[in-house]
Amino acid sequence: MVSRPHGGRLVRRVLSGRRREIFESQYREMPRLEVPLERAIDAEDLARGVFSPLEGFMVEDDYLSVLSRMRLSNDLPWTIPIVLDANREWVLNEGVSAGDDIILTYHGLPIAVLTLEDIYSWDKGLHAEKVFKTRDPNHPGVEATYKRGDILLGGRLELIQGPPNPLERYTLWPVETRVLFKEKGWRTVAAFQTRNVPHLGHEYVQKAALTFVDGLLVHPLAGWKKRGDYRDEVIIRAYEALITHYYPRGVVVLSVLRMNMNYAGPREAVHHAIVRKNFGATHFIVGRDHAGVGSYYGPYEAWEIFREFPDLGITPLFVREAYYCRRCGGMVNEKVCPHGDEYRVRISGTRLREMLGRGERPPEYMMRPEVADAIISHPDPFI
């Protein structure tokens, strides 16, 4: 049976019925807070159950608890703060206080109604140190943190409409994947998180997981990324080619997850597992340096952190780095291959980008030709 939502209940906070009628009659007089795309995406993820059991942006008690203990104030595992920032000037000018309804807008488009419960300040340096394990502004997550407002607003929200989504036809929300898995008769599902196009190492890991479960959820992230990352549509196109040509029919669900990437390493690995639990996954594939960037985290820190959460409710699958062994004649890892480094060919993401950027097909021991062609055919595959 697919996993229960985190906290036991799948959140759904979409404005409807009488509440929507009231909103439509009063919204012109309500205070408005213009938010960037990242917060608009957070709002929709909150409302559609991606971040269950959260029903809105964190109040201070939950925020501080997550920062210090990696658990909500009710002791439920949670590792990444989901917070809404604002400038102090906006708070003073609008005169908002607890109990007020605030419209969150993106490019003027009403996205959600926030019922304000808490207004509090935060220490961005401490936040960076706890979440990212560094205060270095060169870390993309730290840099983004320092650019945010100096006040945080907490409270439950109701979605009016999500921000425009160019990948909507590829997007399934938790309530939809759960129905789909049930229709397929899947009792166990492994989820694979990615922000890259697939090479043979990814395929090796996914198929290893498929050996033990009924189905695979390939769940590429669409949202804020850093320069040099693959474009969302390129990742989808590449995975469609891989699944069509190299997977049995009916064992893989490909769905885009529109969620922000924090590059928070170990903490984010647990966060990604919790999110996939809400989608119904029973297992989550955790790779080497999961959600890492640069050299900020050790290669297997993302494995070690799971020991702190025996009550997580989803099984992590720790997969070793795959490489091509000339002696074995295929993709292997260090646990099953006895041969030395002179036989090992590691797949370099940087080298793949360089080759694909020049319009070259990588060697077939690195990437399937159909996948390479899907990427090369795009006029501008990188952000």
Curated annotation (Swiss-Prot):
Its EC number is 2.7.7.4. Gene3D superfamilies: HUPs, Sulfate adenylyltransferase. InterPro entries: ATP-Sase_PUA-like_dom (IPR025980), PUA-like_sf (IPR015947), Rossmann-like_a/b/a_fold (IPR014729), SO4_adenylyltransferase_pro (IPR020792), Sulfurylase_cat_dom (IPR024951), Sulphate_adenylyltransferase (IPR002650). It catalyses: sulfate + ATP + H(+) = adenosine 5'-phosphosulfate + diphosphate. The keyword Transport does not apply. One of its GO terms (biological process) is sulfate assimilation. One of its GO terms (molecular function) is ATP binding. Keywords: ATP-binding, Nucleotide-binding, Nucleotidyltransferase, Transferase. Pfam families: ATP-sulfurylase, PUA_2. Disulfide bonds: none annotated. Pathway: Sulfur metabolism; hydrogen sulfide biosynthesis; sulfite from sulfate: step 1/3. Belongs to the sulfate adenylyltransferase family. This is Sulfate adenylyltransferase.
